[in-house]
């Protein structure tokens, strides 16, 4: 992953260094407020909108070490689409809490927050409803399986309904292992999930999920 870490105080830089040590297999760049002049850190420019915008469009994850409000203000002008926005995480300077702010599922912010929190001995603050209710998260599942979501509006409706009741799923391909919590096999109902490539709408509101297939021709 390409990860950028931003710190705004001496203690924040100490925590940022700890975070960087936890990510040896990732490409991590660190930046600090200009007044700090920390070794190994780039400088956050005073006119920072374009600076954060470039990282937002390029990075897989942005980690802010400081007040949560800083992260929100800096990313706000650049938020576009949950399918493409990077994971954004905030960590307080004492590393007590690790908070995914943006792209918790598709961008992987929740998983990264759990990973960092476990290594730092911090508390992960997860607020996505499917996670705190231990329910199936269709967008997270699709990313992990390498699938594409056909319609994000339908995905939101599935996520909302699954908090209330189980959702039927039907697939043109075998589903390995046990079904996630909140899913049942079925081919009828008001709302459900279809996995495959056919133009099928087995449910009144069908969320189509497309597996990726690589075709080679000689």
Predicted segments — roles?
Residues 1-5:
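Extreme N-terminal starter segment of soluble prokaryotic enzymes
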Residues 8-37, 41-47, 54-57, 61, ...:
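Conserved mixed alpha/beta catalytic, RNA-binding, or beta-rich assembly cores of soluble enzyme
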């Amino acid at each position: 992953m390409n990860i950028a870490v931003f710190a705004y105080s001496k203690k924040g830089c100490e925590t940022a260094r700890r975070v960087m040590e936890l990510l040896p297999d990732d490409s991590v760049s660190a930046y600090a407020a200009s007044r700090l002049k920390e070794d190994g850190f780039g400088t956050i420019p005073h006119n920072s909108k374009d600076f954060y915008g470039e990282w937002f469009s390029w990075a897989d994850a942005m980690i802010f070490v400081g007040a949560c409000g800083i992260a929100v203000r800096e990313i706000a002008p650049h938020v576009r689409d949950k399918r493409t926005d990077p994971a954004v995480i905030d960590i307080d300077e004492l590393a007590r809490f690790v908070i995914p702010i943006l792209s918790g599922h598709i961008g992987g912010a929740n998983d990264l927050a759990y990973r960092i929190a476990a290594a730092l001995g911090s508390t992960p603050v997860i607020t996505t409803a499917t996670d705190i209710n231990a329910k199936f998260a269709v967008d997270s599942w699709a990313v992990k399986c390498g699938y594409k979501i056909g319609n994000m509006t339908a995905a939101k409706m599935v996520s909302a309904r699954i908090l209330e009741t189980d959702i039927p799923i039907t697939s043109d391909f075998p589903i390995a292992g046990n079904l996630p919590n909140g899913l049942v096999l079925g081919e009828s109902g008001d709302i459900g999930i279809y996995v495959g490539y056919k133009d099928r709408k087995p449910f009144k509101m069908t969320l189509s999920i497309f597996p990726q297939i690589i075709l080679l021709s000689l």
